[in-house]
Amino acid sequence: MRLPQARLDQVLDRFREVEARMGAATDGAEIVKLSKEHAELRPVAEAVERLAKLSAERAELDVMASDPEMAEMVRDEIQALDEKLPVMERELALMLAPKDKDENASAILEVRAGTGGDEAALFAGDLFRMYQRYAQTQGWRVEIDSISEGEMGGFKEIVASITGDGVFGRLKFESGVHRVQRVPATEAQGRIHTSAATVAVLPEAEDVEIEIKESDLRIDTYRSSGAGGQHVNKTDSAVRITHLPTGVVVTSSEKSQHQNRARAMKNLKARLYDMQREALDSARSEARKSQVGSGDRSERIRTYNFPQGRVTDHRINLTLYNLARIMEGDALDDVINPLIAEDQAERLASLEESFS
C-alpha cells in the first residue's frame, strides 16, 4: 500500500508539536494528556522516519543501478529493499488505520449457559476454563466476580475480570453464541446433543468515561450460596446493584461486602460502557456490516464438534481439527489470530478508502 506523503508528514508534524507542548506545559492534567498522546504517536513517528530513510536508500540505489558498472553490485541490495519496503508500509498502514480505542483495555468476561439444560451449563464451564487457561498463557490475571453453578456441574452463569495488557483486543471476537455438538455424560444411548452458551467480552471502563448517579442505583444485599444451595457466609455479604434507568443488574458474591460493592460497580460501568459502544456501533452498522466481531450476541459464531475433534468459526469459514488443544487454551490463538488478521484487513481497506 502506497501511503500518501501528506498523511505521513501530518503524523510527524503532530508528534513534534506534542513534544514541544510537553516541554512548555505546566498544568498537570494537560501534561498527562500530552504524555499519553506522545506515547501513542512515538512508535508511528519512528516508523515513518524508518520508512523515509529506507525509501531514500532505495532511490539512491536506483541512481547507482543506472551505471552499468554498478548495476550488478547493487542488485542484491535492491532486491532486499524491494522485499522489506512493502512489509514496512503495511505495518505503518496498520498503525494509521482506525483503531478500537479499547484495544489495550482489560475486560469483563461473561459466560452463560444457553439452550441445552445441564449440558449447556457444563459447556459454559468448559468455555470459561478455556479462557482461564488462555489468560494464564498470556500472563493476565483472572478474578471471578460472580458465579451461579449448574446442578450437574459447570455454570449457569459466571462473570470474571481479566486484567492485563491487550485483553479486550484479543478476546473481543469471542462475543457471541458458541454451539457444542457432543455426547453428554448423562446420555445412556450415545446420542449426540447440541447445546449452546453465550459469551460477552466487555472493555473495562475507565472511571472518567462513565458517570453513574447514586440516585440511579438500587443496592441490595443478600446471602450468597454455593453449589447445592449451601450457605457460604453467616452474614448477608453478596451485593446486587440495579441501575434503574436501564434495568441493568450486576452482582458480586465474594466474602467481603465492601469488595463486592466495588466489583459490582466496576462491572456495572463496563456493562453501561458496552451499551454506549453498541449504540454507537449500531449507528454505523450499515457501513460496517461485514466487520468481524460486530458483537451481535444473537449470532452463532462458532461450533465445537467433539466427535470430529473439529472447531469451526462461521464468521471467517475457519475449520480446525485441534479441538482438544483449543479447549485447553493452548491453541486458542489458532482461532484468534485469523480473526485479528481479518479485522486488520478490514481496517486497511477502510484506510485505503479514506485515501481515495
From Swiss-Prot:
PROSITE patterns: RF_PROK_I. Residues 279-289 have a biased composition (Basic and acidic residues). It comes from the Bacteria. GO terms for molecular function: translation release factor activity, codon specific. It holds the Pfam family RF-1. Peptide chain release factor 1 directs the termination of translation in response to the peptide chain termination codons UAG and UAA. This is Peptide chain release factor 1. The lineage of its organism: Bacteria, Pseudomonadati, Pseudomonadota, Alphaproteobacteria, Caulobacterales. The gene is prfA.
